[in-house]
Amino acid sequence: SSAASDVYKRQEYMRRALEVAEKGRGRVRPNPLVGCILVKNGKVIAEGWHDHLGGLHAEQMAIHDAEEKGHNTNGAIAYITLEPCNHFGRTPPCTEALLWAGINEVIVAHGDPNPLVRGNGISVLEQAGIKVRSGLLEKEAAEQMREFLHWCQNRRPYVTVKIATDSTGSVDDLSLEAQRFTSDECLERVHQLRKDSCAILVGANTVIRDDPQLTVRLVQTARQPLRVIIDPNNRVSPSAKLLNDGNPVQHLTENFRGLPALLDMLGDMEIQRLVIEGGPTTINYFLEDGLVDEFIPVSYTHLRAHETGRNL
């Protein structure tokens, strides 16, 4: 039926909006990923996404894209992954841009998670006579903005624990003196995970034993994550790489006040995702406090240090 094919088409358009939103990953925080598709007479005439902090919002970029291509946006339908903002932040409100462009219908995947503005953008559009529907592919949008939504609700980062497993799948005993290396593909995944996080946390033992860099080097990144070292007894050497490479670091010594306070502090710094790369001791502290949101297994292969010469 044509109603069913309409629903299917609408989902396809929203899927495309979610797809283009991904182009901003790692570049827009603390803002969420947002994508916008403009459709007119059954054809996609423009697309936009929030590309970098302080840059155009998705709706503004899509409208600009339509103009560049010589398309008239009057009477177009906008598919947007997140409810358009109605306040002046780093840029003017997107609701105004949509009104100005003559969009006559807006389809939204997910409402604004901020309770102060939730529903605001939608009601402003409706008052101006624009037809608004929301909730199309809402689950997919929520998954895409998972860390952002978690931070909005809890004012704390989403905590991911990286578990190192050996070739048999058992958890690596990180207390072994052996240097740990991974396959190239696996290393790249580790670096991608770092890029997608705002902060990386380790305990003193990991720093003392491995002297890691914990930076993103194998994939392109706009900025390095904050490295957090929990070291209440101040055992880490002042010459550790982490403390001397000029990248952001928080070395918590006698000022460490426990994990809940640490997560609150990181939340205040607008850190939305924290990856734990520490050993079993550090991971257990997080588990005991019930503070882990997700586990990611990374399989390590044991090689002797002279066979490959790289550190993490």
Predicted features and spans:
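Short beta-strand scaffold segments in enzyme catalytic cores
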Residues: 34-39, 163
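Active-site ligand-binding patch in enzyme domains
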Residues: 150-152, 156-273, 280-284
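Zn2+-dependent cytidine deaminase-like catalytic core
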Residues: 38-140, 285-287
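Short, basic/aromatic recognition patches
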Residues: 13-27
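Residues at the N-termini of beta-strands
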Residues: 105-106, 199, 273, 294
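Residue-level signal for inorganic ion chemistry
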Residues: 17, 35, 85, 125, ...
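Conserved small/polar residues in nucleotide/adenosyl-binding loops
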Residues: 3-11, 301-308
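Short, flexible loop segments at boundaries between secondary-structure elements
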Residues: 227-236, 296-304, 310
